[in-house]
Amino acid sequence: MKNLKLCFAMLFLLIANSPGFAEQRRKVIIDQDCSGPGGNNMQTLLTLIQSPVVEVLGITVVSGNQWRDEEVAHTLRLLELVGRTDIPVVPGAVFPPVHRRKEAMLWQAKYGKVAFAGAWDDRWWHEHDTIPELLEGPPRTQAADEDGFLIRMVHKYLHEVTIYEGGPMTDLALANAIDPHFAELAEALVFMGGGSSEPQTDDPEFLSAPRHEFNFWFDPEAAKSVLEAPWKKIVCTPVDISVKTRITDGMVRDIKESDSAAAQYVVKFFMKDQGGFYMWDELAAAAWIDPSLITKKDARYMSVDVDHGAADGNTLTWTDKDNPRLGARLVEIQQDLDLARFNKMFVDLMKAPTPRAH
């Protein structure tokens, strides 16, 4: 059995690193609030990096779950551990242009405390330029000094680059503001965010506020402007479908059977004390790689509430019939998935050898 596994691993490496195969890889830039170590943000980076059909052009890092500089450090260290330091890590926005922690705290005092406030959360609050000691050890590599990276890449690879967004949309809003052609030159925008209906869950966080979602809430003005930009295609993985997923102890035990660097990272930093996590961003990434994972979807016009009232940051959606024609664009909204296939795909990717740079 060990010899058979070795043969499969060698075959995987030969295919993934062959010149012809590399030319067929789909290009993506990951924009992510890369909190870590472990957890769904790091596992999303691995989902895309581990796929032999994906070429990760770079990772832009935006404040969200944690502050940007802390997230950059986690990302650099992850790439060191899996041997992919060739992928540039580009620091993005530290703060949303409009929202600040003070405003977020005042909003919660008036309208109710949110379940998760990311970098602003009292439970782990620190100043934006403080980097706590990393459990995985400090990175030895440095972030890339790449001003305008997002814009430069979509101009270099016209209509070939998918923008994967797993955090607040601050970086994308800034890119659109600097270059009005940014969105139209990309292949597509794929993002995790928003909530479009009442999710099928007993989780009180989402039952009481089904249209509230952290990525939109952290920077609603950015999300609204990005969703109004002229993308060729927009695909949304909302809360509704995300809460149907969860990384389980059984999945981690299966991953533990592999000695790949990705597998060892996932196992070491699995946050078991919280009973596993919804696989929000991993699902968005996996469904971009293999759209057949999604078994039900809809199309709605989508925007974000920016009135600074009780619904600030909430998701707004319309059908073609009731669309107010105020700039919202049509978005493909995922509604259901083949959960068994998704779980298997994630486990298999984590157990596989990491594709080399090309």
Sequence positions of predicted segments:
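Hydrophobic h-region of N-terminal signal peptides that target proteins for export
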Residues: 11-20
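Short, surface-exposed amphipathic charged segments that create phosphate/polyanion-binding patches used
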Residues: 103-112, 203-207, 251-252
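Extended, subdomain-level signal for the structured scaffold at the beginning of enzyme domains
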Residues: 42, 69-73, 93, 101-105, ...
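Conformational coupling and interaction surfaces
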Residues: 24-26, 43-55, 214-358
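Active-site histidine-anchored catalytic micro-motif
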Residues: 23-77, 84-85, 122-236, 242
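Bacterial N-terminal signal peptides that target proteins for export
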Residues: 1-8
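Surface-exposed loop and adjacent secondary-structure segments within mature catalytic domains
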Residues: 87-137
